């Protein structure tokens, strides 16, 4: 469900119920040279203006909520100082860096990036910022190609041949930067899916296991415990329990592999313009952010069916292109 309210951002924030929003994304205007905004472009006016909005934004966020602030070098320093004061440096999550088109008219340094500052309302309750590797731009195509190749070999030549091809492909891919983790995913299951065998021992006191319901009996290890009986039964009924040398392991699938969100992103600003063109909205906004960027931030931080707010979308950006994702 999407709703757009046409009103001044500050008035909108005052009407929002406290602690009702999971995620806020904003691309605040600056250096507008326009009379349409409620501040002039002097530093003091802008700082007071952004501070008023961020104070109300913090109040609107749930305890587990996060805010993302798109900004460039023009106002990066001022906005970060203000955000640190309002949210606290302890709740600063990090800075995403997005690439921009190369500019040839710079007098000194060619600036080819912008920033997205990220803060939690309360870092102790913030999401883990984990994301499926198949959704990360750096991994998506290589991993999907690998899974497709192995599935095809499995269908045509069987599990043993798929296993051999997988080892060859992993040897090559794992030499690339960021792909070393693939060395673990060296097995193919009875459906042609890639997985690795995850150890089910835990750093706890040794114990034996006797679960008659699934006919599972394990001797205690010398210095480690076993996963809980509930965990072992769950894996059994999900057909994710396998054994090597009479020891149980979990099938951990490549398609479910996660990683922390990466901070340097390959979402170019010009893609936002193309996204609007696809919607028949060419020229509607001067600097729209790409759908991929907004989607990435939401996937990192926002559970399904959450309420998301952008209280500057009419002024700059992406109610049309971003939140369809």
Specify the residue positions occupied by each region the protein language model found.
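Class I S-adenosyl-L-methionine
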Residues: 1-307
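Ser/Thr-centric signal marking residues that sit
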Residues: 32, 317-318
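Class I SAM-dependent methyltransferase "Motif I" SAM/SAH-binding loop
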Residues: 312-316
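Conserved SAM-binding loop of SAM-dependent methyltransferases across substrates and taxa
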Residues: 319-325
């Amino acid at each position: 469900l999407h709703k757009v309210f046409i009103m001044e951002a500050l008035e909108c924030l005052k009407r929002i119920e406290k602690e009702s929003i999971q995620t806020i994304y904003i691309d605040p205007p600056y250096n507008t040279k326009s009379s349409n905004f409620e501040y002039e472009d002097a530093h003091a006016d802008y700082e007071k203006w952004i501070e008023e909005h961020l104070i109300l934004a913090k109040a609107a966020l749930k305890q587990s909520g996060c805010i993302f602030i798109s900004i460039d070098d023009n106002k990066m320093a001022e906005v970060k100082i203000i955000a640190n004061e309002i949210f606290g440096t302890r709740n600063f999550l990090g800075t995403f860096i997005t690439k921009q088109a190369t500019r040839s008219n710079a007098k000194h340094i060619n600036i080819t990036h912008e920033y997205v500052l990220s803060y939690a309302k309360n870092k102790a309750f913030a999401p883990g910022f984990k994301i499926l590797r198949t959704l990360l731009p750096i991994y998506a195509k290589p991993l999907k190609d690998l899974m497709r190749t192995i599935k095809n070999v499995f269908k045509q030549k069987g599990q043993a041949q798929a296993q051999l091809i997988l080892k060859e492909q992993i040897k090559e891919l794992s030499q690339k930067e960021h792909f070393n983790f693939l060395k673990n995913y060296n097995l193919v299951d009875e459906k042609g899916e890639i997985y690795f065998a995850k150890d089910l021992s835990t750093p706890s006191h040794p114990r034996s296991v006797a679960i008659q319901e699934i006919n599972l009996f394990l001797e205690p290890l010398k210095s480690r415990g076993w996963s809980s009986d509930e965990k072992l039964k769950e894996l059994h009924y999900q057909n994710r329990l396998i054994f090597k040398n009479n020891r149980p392991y979990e099938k951990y699938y490549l398609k479910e592999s996660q990683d922390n969100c990466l901070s340097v992103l390959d979402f170019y600003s010009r893609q936002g313009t193309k996204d609007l063109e696809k919607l028949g909205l060419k020229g509607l906004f001067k600097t729209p952010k790409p759908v991929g960027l907004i989607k990435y931030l939401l996937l990192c931080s926002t559970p399904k069916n959450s309420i998301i707010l952008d209280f500057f979308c009419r002024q700059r950006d992406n109610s049309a292109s971003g939140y369809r994702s």
